[in-house]
């Protein structure tokens, strides 16, 4: 009977751990592998997963494997190669001397001609980098001619069932990025209401 209870308990625990691990893998790239009760907010937690775990080929199983003082996993470029498949794929050195990954155009100085850095995905919310001479580093930009518009892009707008990212082709409203109110002769107007906006031919 004791053996039966032992085996039953072991099986239940194994099932719980297995289910927990399955729930924790938020996506195939595993940018974070612990989900909350609603399955929405993710975090990397070394208590739940072994940051040092390796695959049979010797590579690390998780994109972030270094644990901080709070036992939370951090993404370290010294541990794994950074690339656009990882949620953070630009590396720079922190004050602690370690090299960390970041998804930021600010850390892609050598790649300002490479639009693949900052690709627009859930892993990388900024998908296009442009070198800003005044700031002397790359900044993120949104150009819908580069990628299809969708509701994750800041320049996405839908007007009359038509999707557009161009102020010249859709009716402006206060939800539009180029909508700008100004006052003229005591009257509040918009500079993006067809009357003041450049037309398609301009």
Curated annotation (Swiss-Prot):
Gene responsible for this protein: cp-20k
Signal peptide bounds: 1-19
Glycosylation sites (chain numbering): 41
GO cellular component: extracellular region
Cysteines engaged in disulfide bonds, as pairs: 51-64, 120-126, 149-167, 172-178
Cell compartments where the protein resides: Secreted
Domain of life per record: Eukaryota
Protein name: Cement protein 20
